[in-house]
Amino acid sequence: MTDRFTRLLGIQQPIIQAPMLGVSTPALAAAVSNAGGLGSIAITGSAAEKGRALIREVRGLTDKPFNVNLFCHRPGQADPARERAWLDYLKPLFAEFGAEPPVRLKNIYLSFLEDPTLLPMLLEERPAAVSFHFGAPPRDQVRALQAVGIRVLVCATTPEEAALVEAAGADAVVAQGIEAGGHRGVFEPERGDAAIGTLALVRLLAARGSLPVVAAGGIMDGRGIRAALELGASAVQMGTAFVLCPESSANAAYREALKGPRAARTALTVTMSGRSARGLPNRMFFDAAAPGVPPLPDYPFVYDATKALQTAALARGNHDFAAQWAGQGAALARELPAAELLRTLVEELRG
């Protein structure tokens, strides 16, 4: 299955660098791809032409395959009353930094489902792979991508979601376990999160489905890769492992947190963005989730408020509200150039 997947993507190693929005860069993606893995960029939040520019920037750094990731969430609905209540709740936190919360919240991350300019751009640019998070696009759009040679990967957190991915006609399913850093890829968060671990989910999907399975969540070294492959994965997707690479855009505070004692503990929060995500706990995890918290607005409207608070805090040199996403294996992160890290992972896998 590993050989089948690497041939499908045209890569040498069964390792995908996760498309971490806000952390992955064209330089990181290109370095991973040049070293034989599948580098990734995330273009959610970018207009189609900005996404096109990012794709071309990667292409200027590598002639190897790479992946472009988009969010495919159900579009959020504006709710002025709920948004006002949330902003009022956050007002004391803004006041600590001499700032006022925004007057209203914006939909800062359009879903692939609500931006009709993205599909034509992808069909023109033809990256080797396109991956989707939070849901699968309609089957006709998957077929359109495949018709021009693009491989389609979709994240799933349960066997039920994986069945929907298969029904959509995707080429592979990314099995995201509860250990994974960043946003949970749950399709319908209002139904709850099954919280299945990576290895259990990989085994379930490999045993029941026909698609190649990409293991994602908590995998940080070659032994972790080997364990996932032995359980039926065709490849792995690793995010936190690449955050400390010099090619990532993680800032100094994020890097120091990941290298320090805080990396020993990660937690899930919904107050950062409105959707469950795993990271290094800080005041946004706790102060914004204290007793009396009002019902949250939809994702990504919540994230707009958080980003405004982060900006106010950072202006005073405070990083206590930053999104420092990390998986449960964060303490194993290594500060290596991306190509060297990939070579090390391959050596560990084979050792």
UniProtKB/Swiss-Prot annotation:
Induction: Expression is repressed by NmoR. Is cotranscribed with ddlA. The lineage of its organism: Bacteria, Pseudomonadati, Pseudomonadota, Gammaproteobacteria, Pseudomonadales. Belongs to the nitronate monooxygenase family. NMO class I subfamily. CDD domains: NPD_like. The gene is nmoA. Binds 1 FMN per subunit. GO terms for molecular function: nitronate monooxygenase activity; nucleotide binding. Pfam families: NMO. FMN binds at residues 21, 69, 176, 181, 218, 237-240. The keyword Flavoprotein applies. This is Nitronate monooxygenase. Its cofactor is FMN. Its EC number is 1.13.12.-. Nitronate monooxygenase that uses molecular oxygen to catalyze the oxidative denitrification of alkyl nitronates. The toxin propionate 3-nitronate (P3N) is the best substrate (and the presumed physiological substrate), but this enzyme is also active on other primary and secondary nitronates such as propyl-1-nitronate, ethylnitronate, pentyl-1-nitronate, butyl-1-nitronate and propyl-2-nitronate. Is likely involved in the degradation of P3N, that allows P.aeruginosa PAO1 to grow on 3-nitropropionate/P3N as the sole nitrogen source. Disruption phenotype: Deletion of this gene results in an increased sensitivity of the cells to P3N. It catalyses: 3 propionate 3-nitronate + 3 O2 + H2O = 3 3-oxopropanoate + 2 nitrate + nitrite + H2O2 + 3 H(+). It comes from Pseudomonas aeruginosa (strain ATCC 15692 / DSM 22644 / CIP 104116 / JCM 14847 / LMG 12228 / 1C / PRS 101 / PAO1). GO terms for biological process: response to toxic substance. Keywords: Detoxification, Flavoprotein, FMN, Monooxygenase, Nucleotide-binding, Oxidoreductase. At physiological pH, 3-nitropropionate (3-NPA) exists in equilibrium with its conjugate base, propionate-3-nitronate (P3N). P3N is a potent irreversible inhibitor of the key enzyme succinate dehydrogenase in the Krebs cycle and electron transport chain. P3N has been shown to be a toxic metabolite to bacteria, plants, fungi, mammals or any organism that uses succinate dehydrogenase. It is an enzyme of class 1 (oxidoreductase).
